[in-house]
């Protein structure tokens, strides 16, 4: 435990598990007040309970970033909390399919959540940051947004769009003391990867120079750095964390 972020309020979307949870915990352990979101009330309540158990400052709240009404309700729910100094746009979904078989809803749902969702959340948080002349926005993209991947045209388009969003917004708000960066994880060890067969797991490792999957905490550490004063001269960048899987 430390107090590096004791005066900061951090908003992390999609924080009930995996990378989002690791990011939320990393900031909470360093003294930040963390608003961590989940799509269900059960998961949000579990986040709140875990925070209490660990003596963290913060709360879990329900939010569906794909639903404007949910975002509006969330905005109302956080009115009595301090405005977020640090926003981590992590929430996202996949609906994989080959393009020729992809249904309209598979395309639209992924774009609406993974790309339009960060527009909604950033717009919600940006005005207080502008007034304070300080802010950190970190968008969780993906190696797929850089390298592409068969069966993921929707996901790849959304994550590549997120990188363009990051660069353009960085140019808009840099003069107000706000930095905007993206992190592009490769294959990260999660509950889903734990369920992969040994054959599939080994085939993944063949494409990773370091010969292992990444850990969620390794992504959280990069996000934590980008939010720190040590990264105050870094903006509009995409940091790849993929073990050498992609070196573009």
Model regions: which residues?
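Conserved glycine-rich cofactor-binding loop
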Residues: 9, 16-18
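Conserved glycine-rich Rossmann-like NAD(P)H-binding loop of the short-chain dehydrogenase/reductase
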Residues: 30-46
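Substrate-binding pocket helix/loop in short-chain dehydrogenase/reductase
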Residues: 98-99, 103-111, 193, 204
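Alpha-helical segment proximal to the catalytic Tyr-Lys
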Residues: 127, 171-175, 232
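Residue(s) in the substrate-gating loop at a strand-loop-helix junction
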Residues: 142
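Short, small/polar-rich loop/turn modules that mediate ligand/substrate recognition or access, typified
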Residues: 174, 179, 234-236, 242
């Amino acid at each position: 435990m430390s107090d590096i972020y004791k005066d900061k309020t951090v908003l992390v979307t999609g924080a009930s598990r995996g990378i989002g949870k690791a990011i939320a915990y990393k900031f909470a352990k360093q003294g930040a007040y963390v608003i961590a979101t989940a799509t269900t009330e059960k998961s949000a309540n579990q986040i709140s309970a875990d925070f209490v158990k660990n003596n963290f400052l913060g709360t879990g709240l329900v939010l569906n970033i794909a639903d404007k009404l949910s975002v509006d309700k969330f905005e109302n729910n956080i009115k009595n909390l301090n405005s977020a100094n640090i926003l981590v746009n992590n929430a996202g979904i996949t609906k994989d399919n080959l393009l020729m078989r992809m249904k309209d809803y598979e395309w639209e749902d992924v774009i609406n959540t993974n790309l339009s969702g960060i527009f909604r959340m950033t717009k919600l948080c940006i005005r207080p940051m502008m007034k304070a002349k300080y802010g950190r926005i970190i968008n969780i993209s993906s190696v797929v947004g850089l390298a592409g991947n068969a069966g993921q045209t929707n996901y790849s388009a959304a994550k590549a769009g997120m990188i363009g969003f990051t660069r353009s917004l960085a140019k808009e708000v840099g003069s107000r003391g706000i930095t905007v960066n993206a992190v592009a994880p490769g294959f990260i060890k999660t509950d889903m990867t734990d369920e992969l067969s040994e054959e599939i797991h080994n085939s993944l490792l063949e494409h990773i120079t370091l010969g292992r999957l990444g850990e969620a905490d390794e992504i959280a550490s990069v996000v934590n750095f980008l939010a720190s004063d040590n990264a105050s001269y870094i903006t509009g960048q995409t940091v790849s964390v993929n073990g050498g899987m992609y070196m573009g």
